[in-house]
Amino acid sequence: MDEGNQDGAREERQRSRRARPGAAKSLWKRIRVHIVRSPVTTAILARLIHAWLRLVWTTNRPVSGSDSVIDRIARGERGIGAAWHGQHLMFPCIMPGGHTGAVMVSRSADAELNARVLELAGIDTLRGSGGRANDRKAAERGGARALIGLKRVLDEGKWVGMIADIPHGTPRDAGMGIVTLARISGKPVYPVAYQTSRRKVLERTWDKTTINWPFGRAAIVVGDPIHVAADADEAAMEAARLHLTAELDRASARAAAMVDGNA
């Protein structure tokens, strides 16, 4: 083969390699539509995921200094557990059923699987997405109704859980919904992060989803409570949102450092 043909073949291989991720993503989107529309498939997957999460939870040894939501409950603390998208998969274990009244889950079809897994763990779900203040789209997604429902659960003396950042929005940037819940309920937000020494980060996903593996070390970090005054104005709400963003980042970095031996 002459040099020109070799160059052409090389370029074709490079184009093919570049196209594969996009083709794979497109294929997954087509398959996913059928999965989320099938109640039977969703139920089976939910049970498999729930079993996997229990395996991860029970086979990872907590490192020294690891926190616990159960310990906070025993001390009489109540509030809103907050985590980032991509690090929320262990929520059913971190926020134990019986103590956690409800977790907000997106109204999207994809989130139906998350809701099923939470319900298998004994945690009720309220469907909605919390966006920024005066976000009409958030209201249309049931965010306002879900926030009212979460407030009622908090009024009963139970914990609730929310994913702080907005689905398919800017990752690791807290939305205003969770801050609003803290203001109207009078209950603080607790930044929560979980990490294991054996894990896989899906770099191509929008939220850098973390898959935790069993048989390693685990750490939970529960940050200091973040209070929002009932009369907080727009500037105070934004300050609380930015504070929560920073504290969730800090908790996530701390949990990773603890299991990686860098604490």
Where are each of the predicted segments found?
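Solvent-exposed loop/turn segments at secondary-structure junctions
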Residues: 88, 110, 167-170
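Membrane-anchoring hydrophobic helices of lipid-metabolizing enzymes
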Residues: 2-99, 122-124, 239, 246-263
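Structural motif
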Residues: 80-82, 104, 161-163
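Catalytic-site beta-strand/loop segments enriched in glycine and acidic/polar residues
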Residues: 146-181, 185
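Amphipathic coiled-coil/heptad-repeat helices and related helical stalk/stem segments
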Residues: 65, 87, 143-147, 174-175
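A cross-family acyltransferase "interaction/gating" segment
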Residues: 172-233
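Membrane-interfacial amphipathic helices and adjacent loop/beta segments
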Residues: 43-64, 102-145, 151
